[in-house]
Amino acid sequence: MPGARELTLRVERGALFRRRWAASAASSARAAILRDPRRCALGTRPRWVSFLVIVLVIMNVVTAHPKYPNDPLALVLIELRHPRTEPPVPSAISILKEELARWTPILEQEEVRQVNLETGEHTAHSQKKLVARDRRTAITFRPDAMTLEVTDYPGWEEFRSIVHAMVTARQDVAPVDGCIRIGLRYINEIRASLAEPSGWAYWVAESLLGPGTQLADLKLTTTAQRHVIQCEGPEPGDSLTLRYAGARGAVIQSTPFLQRLKEPPAEGDFFLIDIDSAWSDPCKGIPALDAHLVDEVAERLHTPIGPLFESLITSELRTKVLQQPGQE
């Protein structure tokens, strides 16, 4: 019978092999979807094995990308949409605050302005918000949804535990009638030097960059770009939306209630990789909202996010930027 050290070495070698295999499979899947994004348009049924199926299969052996020292994550959020209801009364808010005090002990009131697109009428209302002392975690109970937002991502296990506590507390104190949609979103702003002649192609997959060479041959200069790819997931009701673009400034802005971990340069270049993984009932029903449902669905929605991100960046970005604390 092998000793403990030999067993450890076998496990490590097996894990290394699986990581390499998964990275290769994810890269092939990413290349396939970006060669012909129409095959994954929402509402169509691809005749080949879908990109998301491949990613979700390889996730049996690969977990999400690590939290890098110089992490590009600007915001991670989950939104649990439910039938519109009255906001929790003050006494219920006090209990929610107490139940979630480990993460968000501060009660704030946010003024929200909305515009009616049909009439042009402006309306304003206030909503309660629970925030962390460092203002990098916020929980909001809106009339039609509850959300958790973090700008200093603690990792999936801790994030998931906050989600579980949020849902449990809300349903114990001021329950909502059901679940319409669950959305999990990771917004990355990649910042790196563009001194290399290849520009962003040095840092991200070249297939993300569009027909730059062809445009340059016609003496056309790209001034803005934004791409959206929508995919059906392997499970009924699952979908994934990938948004990516080169841009300047920032997508995520600090607010009085939610501060960015690092304030970006006002006019700095960045590359956006925004992954939005979502579920809604495939039969158009409204199932009961409880922590068990959210745990199960959120785990499944989270599954492809890390491998997809890792397949869209280069090893140069990983080693020269993301793994270097304090560098941009």
Which residue stretches match the model-derived regions?
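Long, compositionally biased interface segments
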Residues: G268-E328
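Secondary-structure boundary elements
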Residues: G155-E157, S161-I180
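Glycine-rich, often proline-containing surface loops adjacent to acidic residues and nearby aromatics
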Residues: P72-E79, T137-Y153, C179-I187, G268-P282
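N-terminal low-complexity, intrinsically disordered segments
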Residues: V55-P143, T147, L289, L322-E328
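Aromatic/basic-lined ligand-recognition segments
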Residues: V57-I58, H65, H125-V131, R181-P264
